[in-house]
């Protein structure tokens, strides 16, 4: 039976209205995207502020070779294992780019044998910023390079390294090559629009997604975060990212995670870094009568009075170390304030990871914090201890007191070398022989 003319016209009008509304939504979406790009372009400016920050920290005199810019990644490229060499490579690249109009850049990884996620992430970000800068000018930089020889490192460069960061389509690994690899990569760019205030803020959503990534890595090897540990990790990753926004004076941070299950001893790697003021610079800028400065000044005065400060142990190194202790934050105004626990909680998380890994792996878990020109290494030898009431302390000396100088093998001054911000780099091995959940032992009651 044919549809009556009136009904047919009604359905036709309804389809037209739906199509019209769809076109209107699409037009509004394109307009919003165009406006967002315009605003982001204005905020970014003509030159990358991050590349400028890094370039300003480089004291070496550099000349651009006639053959063009070339970055030679060293055999050990790691914030954990060799921060000096890693920083020199990164800062030199930034300065070369800032002082010259680069048309081609070669990044040679062929010598790289040992690396960590953090060093590569910062180097890749410089390349990414230069690529964005070139697009702003309507030009282009051609990037090319050489892969590392070890297969797992080539996979690393493809899955989370320069290939991914620059979206080099013809070098993207196949699904078979990516099988067994877990990647997490989020960045808050300083030139992007603020998120919709009606939605959960970006850093909170990133913290939740990151904890899901870590849990996935652990699940691959018969481990798991307990519900209590999931909650804790979300909270203090959120606080660490919050610190990056609140203290540095420049809202640009990155958090990455990587796991390659195809290697003999899979290593779970974490990199968190931000740009802006270092930890020591933030504390140095506090008023003398502020609560936090009164809280920490006794340590500074004691080291000054005992003439402990010297070339390898400076006031800024002490301030960086003090900031790792419980309840120390430039944002605290009284004893009732509880900011400053994020890094302490991260150290405790690392200690639990270290204990788990030490049971069944020949590889040791390690963590490093690099802020400004101070590098602090964690490998399980020195531990955070003390009561929640009096505050937890890790002083990196036998007495575990901040009134004495720390072990220079663990708390190092990098001299004139400086990173404009803070980097946290963590790596720990995973295996299938342990099923104890991280965070709360299965044989212990949940105290949360």
PLM regions: where:
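Conserved short strand/loop->alpha-helix "switch" segment adjacent to the catalytic nucleotide/phosphoryl-transfer site
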Residues: 114, 118, 215-238
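ATP-dependent phospho-/nucleotidyl transfer catalytic cores
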Residues: 195-224
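Amphipathic alpha-helical interaction surfaces in cytosolic regulatory modules
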Residues: 71-166
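Flexible, glycine-/charge-rich segments associated with ATP-binding catalytic modules
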Residues: 2-69, 283-448
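Short acidic, S/G/P-rich loop/turn micro-motifs used as interaction or catalytic elements
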Residues: 77-82, 110-118, 278-279, 329-332, ...
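Internal, well-ordered alpha/beta segment that forms a basic, Gly-enriched binding/recognition surface
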Residues: 159-206
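ATP-lid-like helix-loop hinge signature
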Residues: 243-291, 360-363, 408-413
């Amino acid at each position: 039976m044919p549809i009556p003319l009136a009904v047919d016209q009604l359905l036709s009008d309804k389809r037209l209205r739906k199509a019209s509304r769809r076109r209107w939504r699409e037009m509004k979406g394109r307009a919003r995207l165009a406006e967002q790009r315009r605003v982001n372009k204005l905020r970014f400016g003509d030159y990358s502020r991050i590349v400028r920050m890094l370039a300003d920290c480089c004291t070496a005199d550099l000349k651009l070779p006639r053959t063009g810019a070339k970055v030679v990644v060293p055999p050990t490229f790691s914030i954990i294992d060799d921060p000096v060499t890693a920083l020199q490579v990164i800062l030199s690249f930034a300065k070369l780019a800032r002082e010259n109009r680069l048309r081609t850049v070669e990044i040679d990884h062929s010598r790289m044998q040992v690396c960590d996620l953090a060093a590569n992430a910062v180097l890749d970000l410089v390349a990414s910023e230069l690529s964005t800068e070139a697009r702003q000018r309507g030009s282009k930089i051609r990037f090319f390079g050489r892969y590392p020889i070890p297969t797992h490192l080539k996979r690393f460069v493809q899955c989370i390294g320069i290939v991914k960061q620059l979206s080099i389509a013809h070098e993207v690994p196949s699904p078979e090559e990516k099988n067994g690899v877990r990647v997490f990569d989020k960045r808050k760019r300083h030139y992007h629009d603020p998120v919709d205030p009606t939605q959960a803020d970006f850093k909170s959503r990133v913290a939740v997604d990151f904890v899901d990534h870590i849990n996935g890595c652990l699940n691959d090897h018969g481990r798991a975060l307990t519900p209590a540990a999931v909650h804790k990790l979300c909270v203090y990753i959120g606080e660490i990212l919050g610190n990056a926004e609140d203290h540095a004076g420049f809202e640009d941070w990155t958090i990455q995670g990587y796991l390659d299950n195809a290697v003999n001893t899979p290593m779970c790697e974490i990199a968190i870094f931000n740009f802006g003021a270092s930890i020591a610079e933030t504390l140095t800028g506090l008023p003398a009568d502020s609560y936090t400065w009164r809280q920490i000044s006794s340590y500074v005065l004691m080291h000054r009075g005992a003439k402990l400060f010297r070339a390898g142990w400076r006031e800024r190194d002490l301030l960086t170390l003090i900031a790792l202790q419980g309840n120390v934050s430039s944002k605290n105004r009284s004893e009732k304030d509880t900011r400053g626990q994020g890094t302490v909680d991260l150290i405790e998380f690392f200690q639990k990871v270290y204990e788990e890994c030490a049971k069944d792996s020949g590889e040791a878990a390690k963590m490093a914090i690099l802020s400004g020109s101070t590098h602090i290494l964690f490998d399980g030898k020195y531990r955070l201890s003390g009561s929640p009431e009096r505050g937890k302390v890790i002083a990196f000396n036998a007495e575990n007191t901040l009134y004495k100088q720390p072990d220079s093998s663990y708390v190092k001054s990098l001299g004139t070398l400086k990173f404009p911000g803070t980097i946290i780099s963590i790596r720990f091995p995973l295996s299938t022989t342990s099923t104890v959940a991280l965070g709360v032992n299965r044989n212990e009651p949940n105290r949360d």
